[in-house]
Amino acid sequence: MPSSSALLCCLVFLAGVAASRDASAPSDSSCTHFSNSLPLMLRELRTAFSRVKNFFQMKDQLDSMLLTQSLLDDFKGYLGCQALSEMIQFYLEEVMPQAENHGPEIKEHVNSLGEKLKTLRLRLRRCHRFLPCENKSKAVEQVKSVFSKLQERGVYKAMSEFDIFINYIETYTTMKMKN
């Protein structure tokens, strides 16, 4: 059984490590730059998406919506952080890898779109007021469930609605900047 002084020493060490890590973490003042660069980042996402938008919207033969009002409601509500985080992960890990399988030109543009989305996610994480979350979003689970059921058509649906996703990102981040 370790002595109480050894345990105390370990606790002091861990507290010091945590304090030094927190000191090197970006502060709220560093988020000011993010708030200023967000419109440009969203514009770059929209421009990158415009290069594949027609391809995926022409292939999307479904009348139903994948990105529904309930997802936007989650973005606007207390689950906004988690919904945004999960949707970025969903597009990066499930949708875009499948979307890249439609020829070299499409792959190049989808890859560029994915890189821009990864950059946005990284900047959101650095500014903790935008992504301080851990709960699960039921609306995101619904999107993933419908996407899976649609199989190949799910890729067309999800990619054809990527502009809606960008709008939801903008709604969420604009709301967070006002808080």
From Swiss-Prot:
The entry's keywords: Cytokine, Disulfide bond, Glycoprotein, Secreted, Signal
Source organism, top-level taxon: Eukaryota
UniProt-recorded Gene Ontology molecular function terms: cytokine activity; interleukin-10 receptor binding
InterPro entries: 4_helix_cytokine-like_core, IL-10, IL-10/19/20/24/26, IL-10_CS
Residues carrying covalently attached carbohydrate according to the record: 135
Chief location: secreted
SUPFAM superfamilies: 4-helical cytokines
Signal peptide span: 1-19
Cystine pairings recorded for this chain: 31-127, 81-133
Keyword Signal carried by entry: yes
GO CC terms, sorted: extracellular region; extracellular space
Swiss-Prot/TrEMBL GO biological process terms: immune response; negative regulation of B cell proliferation; negative regulation of cytokine production involved in immune response; negative regulation of inflammatory response; negative regulation of interleukin-6 production; negative regulation of membrane protein ectodomain proteolysis; positive regulation of B cell apoptotic process; positive regulation of cytokine production
Subcellular localization(s) per the UniProt record: Secreted
Claim: Oxidoreductase is one of the keywords in the record: no
Role of this protein: Major immune regulatory cytokine that acts on many cells of the immune system where it has profound anti-inflammatory functions, limiting excessive tissue disruption caused by inflammation. Mechanistically, IL10 binds to its heterotetrameric receptor comprising IL10RA and IL10RB leading to JAK1 and STAT2-mediated phosphorylation of STAT3. In turn, STAT3 translocates to the nucleus where it drives expression of anti-inflammatory mediators.
Quaternary structure note: Homodimer. Interacts with IL10RA and IL10RB.
Homology family: Belongs to the IL-10 family.
Record-given protein name: Interleukin-10
Lineage of producing organism: Eukaryota, Metazoa, Chordata, Craniata, Vertebrata
